[in-house]
Structures are given as C-alpha cells and as structure tokens.
Amino acid sequence: MQKKFEDCVKTILEIIGENPNREGLIKTPNRVFKAYEFLTSGYTQNVKEILNDALFESSNNEMVLVRDIEFYSLCEHHLLPFFGRAHVAYIPNKKVVGLSKIPRLVEVFARRLQIQEQLTEQIAQALMENVDAKGVGVVIEARHMCVEMRGVQKANSTTTTSALRGIFLKNEKTREEFFSLINSAKQVRF
C-alpha cells in the first residue's frame, strides 16, 4: 500500500514537470505518505471505544461546553486543508464524558476526508448516540484553503456550521444559552 501511494506521488511530481529524483524531492513521496497517514488516521479509530471508556455516572443536568477545539482536516473535494475551531456542548442524561474525550471525538472525524457540514453533523450525532445526552450542540468555524488558495481566492473568509440535537433543537432558551456561551467566551482569554 505504501509503495503504491509513493509511486502515485512520484507520478504527480512528474506530471507537474518536476524531477522526483532531485535532491529536495527524493524523500517527498515518503513524507507525503506519512503526512496523509496521520491526516487520515480517523478512519482507523473507533468512536465508541474512545467515548465509552470515559463515561461516568453523574447527577449533573446542566450544559457542558468545550470550546475553541482547534482542528485540521482535508477537504474531500480538493484534498486541501481546512482548519478552525469547534465548540461542542451537551446536556448530560445521568452520565458525563471525560472532558478530554470531546476534543478526541473532534479529531477522529477531522482526520478523515471531509466537508465541514458533514464534520459538524458527525460530531453531534456521535456524541448524542454514544453519551445518550439530552441534547448536543456543535458549532464549527473554519477557513478553507480550497476557497483561499484557488477558485474564488478569498483570503481569511470563514465558514460557520452548526448541528443541534435533542433539547438544543427543541428548546430556544437552551439554544440561546449555547450560542451566548460561545460568543461571550471569545472575549475571555486565560
């Protein structure tokens, strides 16, 4: 598999007019393989294992928000990076999940070929199903290199997506609290 991948990278280099055997490019196919192996490692990770190992009984029924989770992903259309921050909240239903597992959940889905809309939905759905939360809210703000480097070439533009489940979708006050906490948190830095 690795050799096939590296051969493809060599072919790409040749097609664009480069010499894959020149000094600066000799190890490039291997480097690209390792980079893509890491950037797509989410395909080999199991969401249930990550979350179920860190579920704890709790009487808490208030919103839990982990914000400003930095992520990097690859656009499935152009294989170019998009990156930004995810804000993930849930309301427990007799169980809470370890706080470090929420960024891990974001990473599992971000380290796949993605579109931002799908990434947002997958995070929300996985948290809702695996934690049995009363509700989940996810907002992602990201910059897309396929927009900034090619096509319309609009540098520094951001895309915002949201996914709401359960009480976040049904209850306006819960939804307002979620969006308010995300926005007010932008003003506070430790």
UniProtKB/Swiss-Prot annotation:
Pathway: Cofactor biosynthesis; 7,8-dihydroneopterin triphosphate biosynthesis; 7,8-dihydroneopterin triphosphate from GTP: step 1/1
Domain of life: Bacteria
Catalytic activity: GTP + H2O = 7,8-dihydroneopterin 3'-triphosphate + formate + H(+)
Pfam family, one: GTP_cyclohydroI
Documented EC number(s): 3.5.4.16
Keyword GTP-binding among UniProt keywords: yes
SUPFAM superfamilies the UniProt entry points to: Tetrahydrobiopterin biosynthesis enzymes-like
Keywords, comma-separated and alphabetical: GTP-binding, Hydrolase, Metal-binding, Nucleotide-binding, One-carbon metabolism, Zinc
InterPro entries: GTP-CH-I_C/QueF, GTP-CH-I_N, GTP_CycHdrlase_I, GTP_CycHdrlase_I_CS, GTP_CycHdrlase_I_dom
An example Gene Ontology molecular-function term: zinc ion binding
GO cellular component, one term: cytoplasm
Binding site for Zn(2+): C75, H78, C146
A biological process term (GO) from this entry: tetrahydrofolate biosynthetic process
PANTHER family: GTP CYCLOHYDROLASE 1, GTP CYCLOHYDROLASE I
Family the UniProt entry places it in: Belongs to the GTP cyclohydrolase I family.
Subunit structure: Homomer.
The protein's name: GTP cyclohydrolase 1
This protein's encoding gene: folE
